């Protein structure tokens, strides 16, 4: 039986994808049945991080070693990830939500519609306030754009006002939010967004 929603999490290396998945699992695991597939090129570091954080039971986390371009494994030939998702769905037949975390990639990364239903793209403030206006599919067309690590803005000389202005310009009416995984700011917004994507899921109270 398929899960109700497959969610792709993409973004550059170091943008905070795994930390956001951890926070989302902590926020939603008492309300939804969740599993995670992580992608790394040669290791399973992200899967180990989630396991060690106890965000989910270890058997609900599957690490995939892509052995090559991270973009290929989520777009052109997503079979390795599709198999991993299907294995989790076979083992846990009441899944509401499966996260598929891509390996770190550039602003051109996008998921195959055969693999996920919804794409969340994550960038971080530490990369500079110019990132939103650089565009790319993740910035302009993802179902939700997340601008993470807002606590670092002052330290790196980035303006959140500029990032907000450019994000509104690039995304028009598509949703986006700021987050800080250290404090949890913005995580509830993402969690609510995901719950609203699941037609028959147990809604947040």
Swiss-Prot record:
UniProt-annotated location(s): Cytoplasm
Entry's Gene Ontology molecular function annotations: GTP binding; GTPase activity; nickel cation binding
GO BP annotations, alphabetical order: urea catabolic process
Binding residue positions for GTP: 11-18
Primary localization: cytoplasm
GO cellular component, one term: cytoplasm
Keywords from the named record: Chaperone, Cytoplasm, GTP-binding, Nickel insertion, Nucleotide-binding
NCBIfam families, per the entry: ureG
Entry function: Facilitates the functional incorporation of the urease nickel metallocenter. This process requires GTP hydrolysis, probably effectuated by UreG.
Stored PANTHER family: UREASE ACCESSORY PROTEIN G (PTHR31715:SF0)
Binding partners and assembly: Homodimer. UreD, UreF and UreG form a complex that acts as a GTP-hydrolysis-dependent molecular chaperone, activating the urease apoprotein by helping to assemble the nickel containing metallocenter of UreC. The UreE protein probably delivers the nickel.
Family: Belongs to the SIMIBI class G3E GTPase family. UreG subfamily.
Protein name according to UniProt: Urease accessory protein UreG
Organism encoding this protein: Prochlorococcus marinus (strain NATL1A)
């Amino acid at each position: 039986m398929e899960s109700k929603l497959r969610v792709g999490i993409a973004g550059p290396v170091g943008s905070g994808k795994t930390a956001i998945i951890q926070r989302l699992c902590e926020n939603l695991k008492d309300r939804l049945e969740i599993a995670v597939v992580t992608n790394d090129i040669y290791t399973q570091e992200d899967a180990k991080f989630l396991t060690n954080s106890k965000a989910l039971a270890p058997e609900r986390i599957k690490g995939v070693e892509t052995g090559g371009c991270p973009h290929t494994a989520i777009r052109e030939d997503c079979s390795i990830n599709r198999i991993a998702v299907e294995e989790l769905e076979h083992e846990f037949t009441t899944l509401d939500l499966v996260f598929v975390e891509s390996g770190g990639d550039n602003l051109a990364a996008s998921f195959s519609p055969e693999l996920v239903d919804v794409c969340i793209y994550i960038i971080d403030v530490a990369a500079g306030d110019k990132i939103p206006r650089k565009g790319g599919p993740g910035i302009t067309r993802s179902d939700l754009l997340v601008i993470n690590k807002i606590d670092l803005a002052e330290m790196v000389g980035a303006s959140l006002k500029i990032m907000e202005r450019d994000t509104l310009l690039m995304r028009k009416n598509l949703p986006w939010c700021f987050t800080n995984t250290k404090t949890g700011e913005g995580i509830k917004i993402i969690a609510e967004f995901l719950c609203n994507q699941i037609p028959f899921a147990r809604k947040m109270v």
